[in-house]
Regions:
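Exposed, interaction-prone extracellular/peripheral surfaces
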Residues: 1-179
Length: 179
């Protein structure tokens, strides 16, 4: 299962469980901008709206969480739980400040950091063309030349989010698509 399908399944499952408890569930989908917003509702029939938005979601553009958090905050009223699911592959300079804003608004924030297992282990060999799910052009290279640097960068990114989330009291869950 690729990471987009993994994230869809995760969000659908969490939405289903929360709606079964009659909790209000909303959905905001974003890349560099807010692409779609389904306002929170607690009716079980609301699940079909969540599933529809997840089904039509197509990855595009660069993900910029720090630019979207303000838009999300403006749509949220009162306290609640905000769950962010992303691959967090871009290191954003002000993301810690934006996450702090969410916490200061009385929101309980949970982050699910989802990566494909191959993105973590980087098991590739020989000349390979890598294609982005977003808007980056394909690139051809020999993975052996960059494996160590790449794996260190991925681990640094995971550590960065784990550390900053812990400082802010945010639950951070790292998931690989193989789990």
């Amino acid at each position: 299962m690729n990471k987009m399908d993994y994230a869809r399944t995760l969000v659908a499952s969490l939405s289903y469980l929360l709606l079964k408890q009659y909790d209000a569930v909303g959905l905001s989908l974003f890349n560099e901008n807010l692409m779609s917003h389904v306002p929170p509702r607690s009716k079980p029939s609301h699940f079909k709206h969540i599933l529809h938005e997840l089904a039509v979601l197509s990855p595009s553009g660069v993900t910029r969480i720090e630019d979207v958090i303000q838009s999300i905050v403006e749509r949220l009223h009162g306290r609640g739980i905000l769950i962010i699911v992303s691959d967090f592959l871009t290191k954003e300079s002000f993301v810690e400040k934006k996450l702090k804003l969410l916490v200061s608004r009385g929101l309980e924030v949970i982050i699910f950091h989802v990566l494909d297992s191959d993105e973590v282990s980087f098991p590739f060999n020989g000349d390979i063309i890598f294609e982005s799910l977003e808007d980056d052009p394909p690139i051809e290279l020999d993975p052996v030349d960059i494996r160590e640097t790449y794996q260190r960068a991925i681990q640094d990114q995971i550590t960065y989010y784990r550390t900053h989330c812990a400082k802010l009291g945010i639950d951070y869950i790292f998931l690989e698509t193989s789990t």
